[in-house]
Each structure stands twice: as C-alpha cells, then as structure tokens.
C-alpha cells in the first residue's frame, strides 16, 4: 500500500483530516515520483542485458543448474530460467514505480518458495540469479538510485530465504 493510501486509510479510520506530517510524507513521495520512474525506465530499457548477463553469471557460479540433470539443463529449461529472472526484474520495477513493496508481495512472492520446492527447483539458484541481476542493474544507476533499486531487489531476495 502506497504512502498515500496508507495515510488516507489511517486518517479515515480516525475520522480526521490528514496531518501536516502525513501531508509532508505524501509531498515527498510525489516529488520523488519522477526519480522512481527514471529508475524503472533505465531497468526496463536494459532488461534484456540485465537478464542475459544475470543468467550467464548464475550459470557460471552454479554449473550444477546447467549440467545434465540440472533445472536449467538444455535450451528449453535455460529459457525457462531466464524467463523467471525476467519476471523478478519486472516485479522490482513495479515496486520502484509504486514506491512500495506491495506490488512485489501481492503479484509475485506469495508462495514462491513452495512453488519452486514443488517443481524441484532449488530456490537458492533463483535467489542467486536475482542477486546477479541486482549487481548488474545497480551498476547502471547512480548511488542514490542504486540504493533505491537495491532495496526492492533485497526485498525480493528476502522472500526467497
């Protein structure tokens, strides 16, 4: 839930107007909107490279995944792995745009561990791929923007622990 929605829900629950502090937080959120959109645009524009390089780094670190019997062995399974990495990058951009983890949580992380366990896919490999993408994505951004994006990658990774 965004800071705007949270503030309104809280104020309404108490049958009051928004406080000066709440209005200041909403103002800061609105003013940071263009920056968040720029970060999401950079990640979106570079998504193919981020996913491809992230996958390559993952497969170099975790050769068991692409070896015979591994979950990403063969072209089709490798493509499936890269598709999943792309999905998590997309979720991160949703969080950045919203300025909140709710889209990440509600759209993509509910039951993630259970799903991968049921498929026999090591969640540690998926998490390593997301970590690789985080490093690549954050290298494309300035310090403050990198920290902003890093927060949403870290949130995603936390759900995989």
UniProtKB/Swiss-Prot annotation:
It comes from the Eukaryota. GO terms for biological process: photosynthesis. Pfam families: Phycobilisome. The modification N4-methylasparagine is found at residue 71. (2R,3E)-phycocyanobilin binds at residue 81. Contains one covalently linked phycocyanobilin chromophore. It is a peripheral membrane protein. It is found in: Plastid, Chloroplast thylakoid membrane. CDD domains: APC_alpha (cd12125). Keywords: Antenna complex, Bile pigment, Chloroplast, Chromophore, Electron transport, Membrane, Methylation, Photosynthesis, Phycobilisome, Plastid, Thylakoid, Transport. GO terms for cellular component: chloroplast thylakoid membrane; phycobilisome. Belongs to the phycobiliprotein family. Heterodimer of an alpha and a beta chain. Light-harvesting photosynthetic bile pigment-protein from the phycobiliprotein complex. Allophycocyanin has a maximum absorption at approximately 650 nanometers. This is Allophycocyanin alpha chain. The lineage of its organism: Eukaryota, Rhodophyta, Florideophyceae, Rhodymeniophycidae, Ceramiales.
């Amino acid at each position: 839930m965004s800071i705007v929605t949270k503030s309104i829900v809280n104020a309404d629950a108490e049958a009051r107007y928004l406080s000066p502090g709440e209005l200041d937080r909403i103002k800061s959120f609105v003013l940071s909107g263009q920056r968040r959109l720029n970060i999401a645009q950079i990640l979106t524009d570079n998504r193919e490279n981020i996913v491809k390089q992230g996958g390559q780094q993952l497969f170099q670190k975790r050769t068991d995944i692409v070896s015979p019997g591994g979950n990403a062995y063969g072209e089709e399974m490798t493509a499936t792995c890269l598709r999943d990495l792309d999905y998590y990058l997309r979720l991160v951009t949703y969080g950045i745009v919203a300025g909140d983890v709710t889209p990440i949580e509600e759209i993509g992380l509910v039951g993630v561990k259970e799903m991968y366990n049921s498929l026999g896919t090591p969640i540690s490999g998926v998490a390593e791929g997301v970590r690789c993408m985080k490093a690549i994505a954050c290298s494309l951004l300035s310090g403050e923007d990198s920290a902003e994006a890093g927060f949403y990658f870290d949130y995603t990774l936390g759900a995989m622990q």
